């Protein structure tokens, strides 16, 4: 493990008197404005032209521009939030979305323009760096970082500390892999705005995803905590946990066809593509992520060759349907899946139906006549599985049992020839059982061709055949492309002509694995050479170097714009991609290498100088395995008569056993709307700490979130908020327990005076399977006078039994007894009030590294008994 050395701490600032401390709570010491030459000529309003201009000025790659434009459309569609504080005062048409105050980033303070240098000198930042109080400094003035520096020893250890623009330029692969994976553009209106003016495509609900324990479900029904397949760094399929699902709105979509699979996706949704790279006289293949609209027909796209067989036995709930039928027959029902049972269910899907001769009778019929090779096999399986006697009729046999019909319906086997579907749980079965079901379907309504090299199945239900296609893909078989429609006509005795339509699906591959029981319908095996070559080469192209046992590549057959549809996207822990319909789809910059501890904070300062300015900083932190980093940000702005907007997005990935502490000292002037989205993904044994101080702004809406995705992950939020006259601090936290034995702690303190308003808004969610999780929430509010207000909006969602949860909330006023007691000890009333306030916020104030937030030392006094004055 590598650690950076400690440095000498700064001299303690001069202590304030108690009266100065209480007075300073209502003062703002950073409201001066410097000359604003750049801001005076900046363009107002938001449009596609503005977004394109921002991207062009930053010389960004095309994919980033498209991500911005997509986010702009999301922003325009999403309504303003009506919960929380009143945001009607934001005039998006009057905001300046990009102001460039200097043409290049300075490497030393002396290189900064004089007016900007004077601003940061007054904030004390140059002195902070000279005294080595911070490991690295970044200073953002208006829209861009104007100064950046990192300690040489940290740089030598591989620590990356860059502004987001430089991170995009110098580390495009890492940046593209992680940006927008924790907070997608469609998360909320202001995350979309941030992405647009500083992302991720979407799929339609027709995209079906294999979810562990649930089977094949629509992407619209996938939930956080679900486990789905994705491609790992070795180009093999493995399960990953879903962090979030986002309904991304109605968008134009393409229908793409590849390897007998179809998928609808937006043009900017990324897929894994095999492309050739010229290296001198040699050509090699490499896998890259590319948006669908940039992929040409004929290019090889990653597809699943087979889904890993990670399923087990499914136990059916004990049936209470031991109803005796008219023949005094008592049926019993299987308690778990088996090869025989699945073959029989497949046979029923193809050649079965239910009937109701009268209201007290139900019949389950199998249209397998006595001459059919599987007639006797089917009767034997029914008898062994259910203890049922059958009645043989001309067209097959029947079981007269209402209980049998009800049991089938409970498992999802119901409907007629045009409405039957495969239930989702079938896709959670072992391959052997799935292949047995396909075998039953072939025995009922299928046949073989080319001496067993091809199997065909025909049904009246196109949807059922699409279900079978997905099942075959998961088992490693190769369905062909579009279903073939077949129409037949027949003339009845009365002269009527009846027309019927059916659909045919052809399947190839190792068909000897399919569990057919009709001798003439058995498939033949594929040679090892043939099996290895499937999806590793196409029409003279050989990309075997990229293919693995579970992932291959096939040419994109076509893509067609099919109109606008509702779309969705999901994020998957660690993999950042997922398999849908058998196709692989995707979804300030700090990187700390494995084992490196940055014990001295990295620090960023954000300053708005221009009136009506919109500042949209983007922070991305990746703490690799076993590392530690502390990041501190401070914010100030001038006081103007009209409002400005600060809308930030902070994404943090905390790898196994790493730890991140993120401290914010927000001291915006009272004409700034501070609307921030902050979220961390925390993996096995890792820890995320949010230390949040909100002193300024007109309105703050900020709820730092921790998604604990690995076992023994920890999340903590410690926050303090102060609201004075004309201020509303709507703050809180979100904790999502997505793995077992995770723990979270929320401590929130707020003080309101002079008619100010504070609100705590929090969520603790413990998902199913997150057993052994623990959470504690404590939010306390202090009202200094009778005209201020405090509200608490806690939400707790527990979906697991073995959980420890504690919640406590208080709202109190400074009592006359407290003041009387302190004043009886010789303190004046104002001094007594200051002491009460300091004592109230002390548990959080002592965690704030105020020696690094020099611009706030006259508002939060830590040196006086470790408390806020």
From Swiss-Prot:
Organism: Mycobacterium leprae (strain TN)
Keyword Amino-acid biosynthesis attributed: no
One GO term (biological process): iron-sulfur cluster assembly
Listed InterPro entries: Fe-S_cluster_assembly_SufBD, Hint_dom_C, Hint_dom_N, Hint_dom_sf, Homing_endonucl, INTEIN, Intein_C, Intein_endonuc_central
Domain (DOD-type homing endonuclease): residue spans on this chain: 344-477
Protein's name according to its UniProt entry: Iron-sulfur cluster assembly SufBD family protein ML0593
GO molecular function: endonuclease activity
Entry keyword set: Autocatalytic cleavage, Protein splicing
A Pfam family the protein falls into: Intein_splicing
Family stated for the protein in its record: Belongs to the iron-sulfur cluster assembly SufBD family.
SMART domains, alphabetized: HintC (SM00305), HintN (SM00306)
Changes after translation: This protein undergoes a protein self splicing that involves a post-translational excision of the intervening region (intein) followed by peptide ligation.
